[in-house]
A protein has these predicted regions:
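Positively charged n-region of N-terminal signal peptides that target proteins for export
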Residues: 1-5
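Bacterial N-terminal signal peptides
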Residues: 7-14
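Sec/Tat signal peptide C-region and signal peptidase I cleavage site
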Residues: 16-20
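Glycan-processing catalytic domains of CAZymes
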Residues: 21-505, 510-513, 521-531
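C-terminal beta-sandwich/jelly-roll accessory domains of carbohydrate-active enzymes
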Residues: 391-679, 763, 812-814, 826
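Edge beta-strands of extracellular beta-sandwich domains
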Residues: 653-657, 803-804, 858-864
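Extracytoplasmic
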Residues: 667-812
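C-terminal outer-membrane/trafficking sorting elements
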Residues: 812-865
Length: 865
């Protein structure tokens, strides 16, 4: 009864969140109990949206928002509208939540002035959740060459004006605007604080209706990570962003850089003086990207996980084709093993309550202070960048959680440029939010510890030792050692903080302010140790010795410890770039050697016991333990996620301990599904299985085609037996207007179209005027199976290139007596042989299919298999 009452109360609270703004309810609530994972259907993968949707595990899918990600590269995404107009229909039919990413930087697939277009997706698609804009710091106010001429990108202020309209649409229709921020130095005037200072209408909208704004930190650039975190966290805690998220990007890793001489100048390539020599350090260690996601979700309340990027090297890729039993060739896509072992597995731990997302109120209470950036910009309308009015005061993080290796104070005079690490060396101090202002009552529970305008002259903050002393009074010491360890209630987030094993090489003389060369060698041997003071457990100490890039999420209870451990990596030195064919095969992505992490419990009254299990799919781990001199030591040798429980883990340290019963329980609620879509369906022929065809072009640009929908097309050719077959689900059985878009440049082509037991022979007339124009032919066809296939066979005539097929419902099935209404849906299906014997499924050859409709009516047909 208690549990039911809690769920009822929680449901009321969730409803209240959805109704918090003055407008329609949010289509899909995002909150700590309903987190969102944005998974990309990305044009760089030439994907089949249906295949990507099918790949997402069913337990995760309700929480996923699919992101239709459009490239600014014309050859990848020639016409963004033609891509999303096709893919949105597939997502709508699947009833999965979907956003559109029209732009990275200033380059956009859509005109910033076409407001009717932006609104139309809300009107047409009940599953549409809004717009996702990435990397809003580059490419503004520039000429960009296209095949048919030059286009000029908008200014940043013009884009900000568009965002005000998108916020109003989000308010009107219950959607979101998601923006990811990734350059705190050279584009500081495009950070979240700048949204409040540079556009009065945006300020008003974010101040009064913040629920529609998702503010994400992004890791694309190789500097300024702490500033980006502080600015985005400040927007969330300060009350001008409804949600706080993370879009991790491997591009932030220092894989290589220009090779420099003793004077700090780039060394020219002797074989090509237009290029410079590169010094290679290491491929990105995948586990290093898991750390900020888990840290920020568990400690600072991020409710949105976007990506990660790069999608083509870290999420999924198109792999080798396969052949069906009846000879069709099928295109395939697959997750990378590191995506499965890190991202899918960690999200599952959020959904099962292991990793609890704290509320905004909890994060504010834990964070305690903020920095208020009160510096007035010189000219808000100028494109000239300023840093001081928009980001943190220089030196804010020094002596707190910034590594001395990362800055050392002297490489460059700009502290933000020097910040190459996102890992933190201390978990004692929470991430410091930088705010424009404290907008609402909850935000005002934060103390403004210092204003930016006063930072340099303030003796407490401008001096590292005094700043640290001030922070030590606010945040007590709960552990010792060189690991990162931070606690919220009974949860500890711990990791090895050594992102790089840096080498600093002094220059012969200072070069434009640079005093030494930084070399970013991977940490392949430096472990980190720490001793934690338990807050709930009654043993005296918990010690950890963590290998490079190891991450531990630990929950302590009075008599046990529950640990989730993560360190998945692939072999170093592979150096595969985007488009490398070797990425198609997992055999070319071997695992990294297993590393050993050690957990030591000190002060248990009796020998504890352990239980553990490997998660996901990686080499089998080995876990051993020993009990000696009052210490219980667990050795975990692994490369990948596992769960470890240390039971009977209790001692005599009971004074001052927090109670297990006071721990906040994680509550996860399944988000509501989108309403059913009743509109036009569209399917791309490049996603159909095929045999004996002239060619299947997943991206048809380089094959000379233009004006296609989706990203490609299929050359049916003229071979005997040429055929394509694709999955074409519809919302209900009935008679449909079928439109096939095609090119027939050399003459008429005749095809046979088959849906279920109905066949139509269709002539595709020769293009009237141009060999490159697309034509359409329309005809009516009954579609009885709502989850069926369409087959198109070549019959005679000239070559036809097939682009897509559209399906529009007209009315009831015409070929079946007794079906008279468009409300008839299939209840169940039975199969029989020709002797009338019931079958469990259709058999090879001829079977009888009997369909029972929900109205009580039935129809029968012969099927051939």
């Amino acid at each position: 009864m208690v549990r039911r009452l809690f769920i009822f109360i929680f449901g009321i609270l969730t409803f209240a969140v959805a109704q918090a703004h003055d407008g329609p309810a949010l289509r899909r609530v995002i909150s700590p109990s309903q987190p969102a994972w944005i998974i990309h259907i990305d044009t760089w993968n030439s994907p089949n949206p249906q295949a990507i949707i099918n790949m997402v595990p069913e337990d995760i899918k309700p929480y996923v928002i699919f992101n239709l990600s459009l490239s600014a590269t014309e050859s990848i995404c020639a016409d963004g509208k033609k891509v999303v107009d096709s893919w949105m229909k597939v997502c709508a039919e699947n009833r999965v939540w979907t956003m559109i990413q029209p732009a990275s930087g200033g380059c956009s697939a859509f005109d910033d002035d076409d407001l009717e277009l932006y609104e139309s997706y809300y009107k047409n698609y009940p599953n549409f959740l809004g717009w996702n804009y990435a990397e809003q710091f580059w490419g503004f106010d520039e000429d960009r060459e296209r095949e048919n001429g030059t286009v000029h990108t908008p200014t940043f202020l013009k884009r900000l004006e568009l965002f005000t309209h998108l916020m109003k649409f989000a308010h009107q229709y219950g959607g979101y605007l998601c923006v990811s921020f990734t350059q705190a130095c050279y584009s500081a005037n495009m950070m979240p604080v700048a949204y409040m200072k540079r556009n009065a209408e945006m300020n008003r909208l974010l101040s009064t209706d913040k629920e529609h704004f998702i503010c994400c930190e992004k890791y694309t650039m190789k500097n300024g990570f702490y500033d980006i975190e502080s600015n985005c966290l400040g927007a969330y805690l300060g009350g001008y962003a409804g949600q706080y998220g993370i879009r991790f990007d491997i591009c932030g890793w220092m894989e290589e850089q220009d090779k420099l001489d003793e004077n700090g100048n780039a060394i020219k390539d002797p074989s090509d003086d237009t290029k410079t020599l590169k010094e290679y350090y290491n491929d990105f260690p995948k586990a290093c990207g898991a750390i900020p996601i888990l840290e920020h979700v568990a400690l600072t309340g991020e409710t949105v996980i976007d990506g990660p990027e790069l999608v083509t090297t870290d999420d999924l890729r198109e792999i080798a084709t396969s052949k069906t039993a009846d000879g069709y060739i099928r295109r395939n896509w697959a997750w990378f093993n590191h995506f499965k072992n890190i991202n899918i597995d960690m999200f599952r731990k959020i959904l099962d309550g292991t990793i609890r997302i704290p509320s905004r109120e909890e994060v504010i209470a834990r964070t305690k202070i903020c920095v208020k950036n009160d510096i007035k910009p010189k000219d808000i309308n100028s494109s000239q960048n300023e840093m001081e009015p928009y980001v943190s005061p220089s030196g804010l993080y020094d002596g707190l959680y910034r590594s001395e290796q990362d800055d050392n104070g002297t490489q460059w005079p700009n502290s933000t440029v020097n910040n190459k690490w996102w890992l933190k060396v201390s978990g004692r101090y929470p991430a410091i939010p930088v705010v424009y202002d404290l907008i609402d009552e909850e935000a005002r529970k934060l103390q403004v510890a210092i204003k930016s305008s006063e930072y340099a002259s303030n003796p407490t903050w401008s001096n590292v030792a005094s700043k640290k002393a001030y922070m030590n009074q606010l945040f007590k010491q709960e552990y010792k050692g060189d690991i990162y360890a931070s606690r919220l209630e009974n949860t500890w987030v711990c990791y090895n903080p050594y992102q790089y094993n840096e080498e600093h090489v002094p220059l012969a003389a200072t070069n434009h302010g640079m005093k030494y060369i930084r070399k970013y060698w991977v940490n392949n041997g430096r472990s980190a140790k720490g001793t934690l003071k338990p807050a709930y457990n009654t043993c005296s100490q918990i010690k950890m010795n963590l290998a490079p890039y190891s991450l531990v999420h630990m929950r302590e209870y009075s008599d046990k410890l529950s640990l989730y451990m993560q360190n998945y990596r692939i072999k170093d030195g592979l150096r595969y770039g985007v488009g490398d064919g070797r990425l198609q095969d997992d055999k070319n992505l071997p695992e990294y050697a297993q590393q050993t992490d050690t957990i030591i419990v000190v002060g248990a009254s009796a020998q504890p016991t352990i239980s553990w299990k490997d998660n996901s799919d990686h080499s089998a781990s080995t876990v051993t333990s020993e009990w000696k001199n009052g210490q219980f030591t667990v050795y975990v040798k692994h490369n990948g996620p596992l769960e470890l429980t240390i039971d009977n883990c209790k001692g005599t340290k009971t004074t001052g301990k927090l109670k297990d019963s006071d721990v906040t329980a994680a509550v996860i609620e399944t988000p509501a599904a989108p309403e059913a879509y009743e509109g036009e369906m569209q399917y791309e022929f490049e996603h159909f299985d095929y045999k004996n065809v002239g060619g299947c072009y997943g991206n048809a640009w380089n094959n000379g085609f233009r004006g296609y929908y989706g990203q490609g097309c299929l050359n049916l050719g003229t071979q005997r037996g040429a055929s394509v077959r694709g999955y074409i689900p519809v919302t209900k059985p009935g008679n449909y207007k079928v439109a096939i878009r095609y090119q027939a440049s050399m003459g008429d082509a005749v095809i046979k179209v088959i849906c279920g037991n109905q066949t139509k022979q269709v002539t595709l007339p020769k293009n009237a005027s141009s060999s490159k124009e697309w034509s359409e032919v329309e005809f009516d066809m009954d579609i009885a199976d709502v989850k069926g296939n369409m087959t198109v066979n070549y019959v005679s005539g000239k070559r036809a290139v097939l682009d897509c097929v559209r399906l529009n419902y007209k009315g009831a099935l015409t070929g079946i007596a007794g079906v008279t209404t468009d409300a008839d849906l299939i209840d169940h299906v039975e199969y029989y042989d020709l002797q009338g014997m019931r079958l469990s499924a259709a058999k090879q050859g001829i079977s009888i299919k009997k369909v029972y409709l929900r109205s009580g009516k039935t129809y029968t047909e012969k099927i051939y298999k």
